[in-house]
Amino acid sequence: MKASELRGKDAAGLNQELSELLKAQFSLRMQKATQQLQNTSQLKKVRKDIARVQTVLTQKANAK
């Protein structure tokens, strides 16, 4: 997901996206802890996506 795509969403949509990403991150962490996760690079991708969403939310909040 690109930051330009995120900038087109409103704050409610971004908060929902953030919530889904945090749930996905938790699930991936549990899979990693129980050694069920095959593709560990997914953790990095989700972490970066969370950072992107939080950055766009902060930018929108500071713009007001």
UniProtKB/Swiss-Prot annotation:
GO terms for biological process: translation. This is Large ribosomal subunit protein uL29. Belongs to the universal ribosomal protein uL29 family. Keywords: Ribonucleoprotein, Ribosomal protein. The gene is rpmC. Pfam families: Ribosomal_L29. GO terms for cellular component: cytosolic large ribosomal subunit. CDD domains: Ribosomal_L29_HIP. One of its GO terms (molecular function) is structural constituent of ribosome. PROSITE patterns: RIBOSOMAL_L29.
